[in-house]
């Protein structure tokens, strides 16, 4: 099958198509993980994006459902140097996702690194793609909006409330689902936490009706500035019970506290990002997947930075300056402590979430 990748600057990259015969548009990004292609493809945060893998060989250890981070592939397309194994090919076909192989992913990555993320089109076809078609494809890419103009979270958030581990709880959490990864739910459940997953646009009153011990705002795709409805809910919850966040959830908490976010040139996507705990000086290697970040020049009043990225000094964690009342606790991290895929250095943060919930639950009893 023929494959073509068209970039907004008119660059044409031809290769071998695999997966579904399809045409998709999206923001072209790169991921530096050496393994974890199943988790990456099924991560809802990749909605609206075409993923280029920097590691040259993909598909060499198959596909298992237990590795899924959602109910299927959420990325728009897949770009690899070499694809091996029929399972990855069939996996993409099952979810109608095109892929292209036999291309210079190093060239693509360096282009993104120098110019920033790029609007692009990926097409696969059993018929040769002609020069005349190229002109039309370039036009489609140029007319495609920037990802910050697309409201992606409603496409990946749950439509109804889902409860996990209801019978065996030490504490309970309402998880505001902006596109949550299953690994996050699993990390909470493994620690004896009941998780009530609710839609991204749930209101404060509905969330409190579940009598949770803390709230976790999840990861997800797109620009946090598009999610003012969720920001308002988070703002209204702060001071009522402990509030935590991961990735997009961290950005929403930043805005709710009065801070600002901005779009990174090419983002952080991979399992090898070093993060420093400002207070302790400890460094963790973390898994990350984000294209927006907290502006360190506008730290919200009454808040402080927790963690910084050692590669580019961007903000990786923020918290509300602690008060004696646990209900005022607010903290969030930009990286993914659950990994999925990646290192587990920061999974202790889920222990801290659960301990926070247990403590608040005990105080509520009085």
UniProtKB/Swiss-Prot annotation:
The pathway this protein participates in, as annotated, is: Amino-acid biosynthesis; L-arginine biosynthesis; carbamoyl phosphate from bicarbonate: step 1/1; Pyrimidine metabolism; UMP biosynthesis via de novo pathway; (S)-dihydroorotate from bicarbonate: step 1/3
Known catalytic reactions: hydrogencarbonate + L-glutamine + 2 ATP + H2O = carbamoyl phosphate + L-glutamate + 2 ADP + phosphate + 2 H(+)
List the active-site residues.
Answer: 247 (nucleophile), 336, 338
- SUPFAM superfamilies the UniProt entry points to: Carbamoyl phosphate synthetase, small subunit N-terminal domain (SSF52021), Class I glutamine amidotransferase-like (SSF52317)
State which Enzyme Commission number(s) the record gives.
6.3.5.5
Keywords (alphabetical) are: Amino-acid biosynthesis, Arginine biosynthesis, ATP-binding, Glutamine amidotransferase, Ligase, Nucleotide-binding, Pyrimidine biosynthesis
What PROSITE patterns has UniProt attached to this entry?
A: GATASE_TYPE_1 (PS51273)
Q: In which residues is L-glutamine bound?
A: 45, 220, 222, 248, 251, 289, 291-292
Q: Where is this region: CPSase?
A: 1-172
Query: Which GO BP terms apply?
Result: 'de novo' pyrimidine nucleobase biosynthetic process; 'de novo' UMP biosynthetic process; glutamine metabolic process; L-arginine biosynthetic process
Which positions fall inside the Glutamine amidotransferase type-1 domain?
Answer: 172-363
| Alphabetized PANTHER family for the sequence | CARBAMOYL-PHOSPHATE SYNTHASE SMALL CHAIN, MULTIFUNCTIONAL TRYPTOPHAN BIOSYNTHESIS PROTEIN-RELATED
Q: What does this protein do?
A: Small subunit of the glutamine-dependent carbamoyl phosphate synthetase (CPSase). CPSase catalyzes the formation of carbamoyl phosphate from the ammonia moiety of glutamine, carbonate, and phosphate donated by ATP, constituting the first step of 2 biosynthetic pathways, one leading to arginine and/or urea and the other to pyrimidine nucleotides. The small subunit (glutamine amidotransferase) binds and cleaves glutamine to supply the large subunit with the substrate ammonia.
The entry's family comment says: Belongs to the CarA family.
HAMAP family, sorted? CPSase_S_chain (MF_01209)
Listed under subunit, the entry gives:
Composed of two chains; the small (or glutamine) chain promotes the hydrolysis of glutamine to ammonia, which is used by the large (or ammonia) chain to synthesize carbamoyl phosphate. Tetramer of heterodimers (alpha,beta)4.
- Indicate what this protein is called per its UniProt record: Carbamoyl phosphate synthase small chain
Protein species of origin:
Methanococcus maripaludis (strain C7 / ATCC BAA-1331)
Designated gene of the protein: carA
């Amino acid at each position: 099958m023929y494959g073509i990748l068209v970039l907004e600057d008119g660059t044409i990259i031809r290769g071998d198509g695999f997966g579904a015969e399809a045409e998709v548009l999206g923001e072209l990004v790169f991921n530096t993980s050496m393994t974890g292609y199943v988790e990456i493809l099924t991560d809802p945060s990749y909605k609206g994006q075409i993923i280029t893998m920097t590691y040259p060989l993909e598909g060499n250890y198959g596909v298992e459902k237990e590795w899924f981070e959602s109910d299927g592939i959420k990325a728009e397309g897949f770009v690899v140097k070499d694809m091996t194994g029929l399972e990855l090919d069939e996996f993409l076909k099952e979810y109608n996702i095109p892929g292209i192989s036999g291309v210079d992913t190093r060239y693509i990555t360096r282009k993104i690194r120098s110019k920033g993320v790029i609007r692009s089109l990926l097409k696969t076809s059993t018929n040769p793609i002609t020069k005349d078609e190229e002109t039309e494809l370039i036009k489609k890419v140029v007319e495609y909006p920037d990802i910050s103009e697309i409201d992606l979270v409603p496409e990946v958030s749950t439509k109804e409330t889902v409860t996990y581990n209801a019978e065996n709880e030490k504490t309970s959490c309402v998880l505001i689902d902006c596109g949550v990864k299953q690994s996050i739910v699993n990390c909470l459940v493994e620690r004896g936490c009941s998780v009530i997953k609710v839609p991204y646009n749930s209101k404060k009153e509905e969330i409190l009706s579940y009598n949770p011990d803390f709230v976790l705002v999840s990861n997800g795709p797109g620009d946090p500035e598009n999610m003012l409805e969720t920001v308002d809910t988070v703002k209204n919850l702060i001071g009522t019970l402990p509030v935590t966040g991961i990735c997009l959830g961290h950005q929403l908490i930043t805005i709710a506290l009065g801070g600002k976010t901005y779009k990174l040139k090419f983002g952080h996507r991979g399992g090898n990002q070093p993060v420093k705990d400002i207070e302790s000086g400890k460094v963790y290697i973390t898994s990350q997947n984000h294209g927006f970040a907290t502006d360190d020049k506008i730290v919200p009043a009454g808040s402080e930075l927790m963690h910084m990225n050692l590669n580019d000094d961007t903000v990786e964690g923020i918290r509300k300056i602690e008060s004696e009342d646990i209900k005022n606790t607010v903290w969030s991290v930009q990286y993914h402590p659950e990994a999925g895929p990646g290192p587990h250095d920061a999974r202790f943060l889920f222990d801290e979430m659960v301990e926070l919930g247990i403590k608040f639950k005990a105080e509520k009893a009085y």
